[in-house]
A protein has these predicted regions:
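Divalent metal-binding pocket/active-site signature
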Residues: 1-83
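H/E-rich (His + Asp/Glu) clusters that bind or coordinate divalent metals
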Residues: 45, 51-59, 64, 68-192
């Protein structure tokens, strides 16, 4: 139905794959799991394994080729941009956004910069919640060439981040042009 009507579908499946891994020193989200133990799904009888959830999501993309999907949070592939690129190549009806996973991009600036250039028509700005102070970190990662700065939330990232220094045209697409293409009823003059 959405495909027939030209309505994009935002789809959020699973959570970070680390929430299914053992809570030990090899899990980069261990501190978040310590703070919020209800986010650990590794021993759940109710929540399916991560890969099963993602496979089901990809089956939906395959079955509904005429529907545009916005795969939230880089499809939880921010740690593997090569895999995410292959995913976008496989599913031309999928775009993505990077709400809550900017840290994964800021720790691999060269790879992330090239990924954004290569897939500039398939990436949209995303944010899980409105907190004005957090936007500065997003803008700093995307727009600057700053080095070795902190992420705003310690439970997500114990590494420093670096700016991607994206070209202006890529930034415009990520910030608003891609959204205007997907949602043509948004007044374009808001962005001129």
């Amino acid at each position: 139905m959405c495909g027939e009507l030209g309505i994009p579908v935002l789809i959020h499946s699973a959570d970070p794959f680390q929430f299914w891994l053992p809570k030990d020193d090899q899990n980069e989200r261990w501190f978040e799991l310590k703070e919020k133990p209800n986010r650990f799904y590794g021993d759940s009888d109710f929540i399916p394994p991560f890969e099963e959830i993602i496979k089901e999501q990809h089956t939906v993309f395959e079955r509904h080729k005429n529907t545009t999907f916005i795969n939230a949070h880089l499809g939880w592939m921010g740690n593997d941009l090569k895999r995410l690129g292959e995913h976008l190549d496989e599913f031309p009806n999928v775009v993505t956004e990077f709400g809550a996973v900017i840290a994964e991009l800021g720790r691999q600036p060269k790879t992330a910069r090239q990924f954004f250039i290569d897939y500039q028509d398939r990436i949209m700005f995303g944010k899980d919640s409105y907190n004005k102070e957090e936007f500065y970190t997003y803008f700093r990662v995307l727009e600057s060439d700053d080095e070795y700065f902190n992420y705003f939330r310690k439970r997500h990232a114990f590494w420093k981040m670096y700016g991607l220094n994206l070209p202006d045209e890529v930034l415009k697409k990520v910030y608003y042009k891609n959204a205007l293409r997907l949602f043509p009823s948004i007044p374009k003059e808001l962005f001129e």
